[in-house]
Amino acid sequence: MQDTSSAINSVYEDTKDFLIVGLTGRTGSGCTTTAQKLCGDEFNIPTDGYDGLTRNELKKHQIIKKYLDGVEWIPFYKIEASGLITYQLLQLSKSEFIAYFSSQTFGNPLSQKEASSLFSALESNRKKNLTARNKHHIQEHEIDTFFDFHFIDIPQLTKIIHSRLGKAKFTQFYQRAGDNVRASGRANDQNFNPEQLFNFPKHLNFLIKLAHKKARANNVPCRIVIDAIRNPYEAFYLKRRYANFYLVSINTTNTERLRSLREYRKLTDAEIKILDNKEYPEKISGAKKFVVQNIQECIEVSDIHIHNSKISEYTQNDLVSQLAWYVTLMMHPGLVMPTSIENCMQIAYTAKQSSGCISRQVGAVVTDESYSVKAIGWNSTPQGQLPCLLRSAEDLICGRNKSDFSEYELTNPTFRKALASKYSNLIATNKSSNRNFSFCFKSIQNEIEGEKNQVHTRALHAEENAFLQISKHGGQKLLGGVLFTTASPCELCAKKAYQLGFKKIIYIDPYPGIATQHILSAGKNKPELELYRGAVGRAFYQLYQPLMPYKDEMELIFDIPSFENPEKPSKSILKKENAALLEANKTLQMEIDSLRLIVSGRQP
């Protein structure tokens, strides 16, 4: 039994020994607090979880707590994105450093004298011979030196810069420098260089490998938390390289987020507006997609969503309980089952892959009050019309596949002129391209009208599609039900949901419009709005699919004896008894034969 128990431990060794958690979320949501919890020497899980847990969920929480309490807690290594920016600032010469710090236009920029003083404070660390050209060939005797520089010295230098600049100015300065690093590989150069596209995640990758070397040298598991990932391509880079990488979004209500920014970070409303415009830009195009912060898309592609209610600044029971839940499942998949809410949102997440929209994919699920699924939907064109992803501007310009297009698209001269001006030369000069030239009707029509009109979209919204599926196929009661959406309802879908009488709307990413404040918060039958907490996508299966049936695992770890009821013996027991009797008969027969030989005077 000891051998099989050791074998089970070996099965889970990879999941326990190497974990990477990348945090994402808007400033003020709690990413830094989450990282601090994971990096602590202790991880104290509340016995009763947090408010709102169902009876089954409380049972699962207790199983999670028992598991984590029964193993030694290993603190996570923390990689701060701000540290990567500090490292790039250290690569600047003195003149470049002073020029860059004193040239910023926001707030009150540092004077050249102040910038020179700051440079002097960092000078001793700049002299350490830890440059990009030798960091990829770390010898075993150099591990501690490199580790101390990147995981101890750099964070301390970041704090020095933070104290000199102040909170608001530091945030703006580092966001801009971070964009520059993503664009050019240098903190003071904003010109886009495609060869430096993955400079940021490659540096993250180096630090991950460095932490792994350090952990192996110390003979301890390697667990890493990254605070925080702000561009989705950084997450994609790491997801492709590490099976045990999880992107975790930390979310809170906008009210709590704003309160945190005002009370704890002491930001003014003007500074908060600048921050929000930076993290949630209205539209990102061209090379900026690879450069600027895009928190909305980071949240969309997250593997795990954690709701930080911020009910108490002292206990943070809900945050700690959720972290415990998912860290445990990362180490031991399938220890508990998913919640009903996770099951429903996973269906919505799967449904969104059916969307033919070339701008954004959204999925929705409608259930009754017991989470019994009644309909699913995704944003796409009405049944019978071809989704935008499958249509081609080349076909429309050349007059092919006319049934794919509307009469307006085929005959309106202004629209055809606009389409041709955008795509004719593009198609002609890229004949060898292997891409389908799909186009967005709404975008072209809005360019013609010089407006931003959402009415021109060809697709039904995911929530709207789910509502219509029910009425289309016979109709069912929805009053008191629950709406799940991988985004959140717009103003139009919010009104429909309100009219249908949903008691709860569970969403992942807040819609930037006024649907919540203006529509869903009015009247006497207001639905409850709940930020989603749970796993989705590949993480759902990776966390909840056990490596082997739990019964088999228990039997291999523990020597569980069988119970034998003498009054109702099982077939296996009877077989054992028959075999024993048969063996006894053989022995007895041999003794009888031996006695016969003795009696007859012959020796046996």
State what each model feature region is:
Residues 210, 234, 263-321:
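Small-molecule kinase domains that catalyze NTP-dependent phosphoryl transfer to phosphate-bearing small molecules
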Residues 59-122:
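P-loop NTPase motor core
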Residues 227-229, 238-265:
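Conserved phosphate-donor/acceptor-positioning beta-strand/loop module used by diverse small-molecule
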Residues 97-118, 128-211, 287-291, 296, ...:
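Zinc-dependent deaminase catalytic domain
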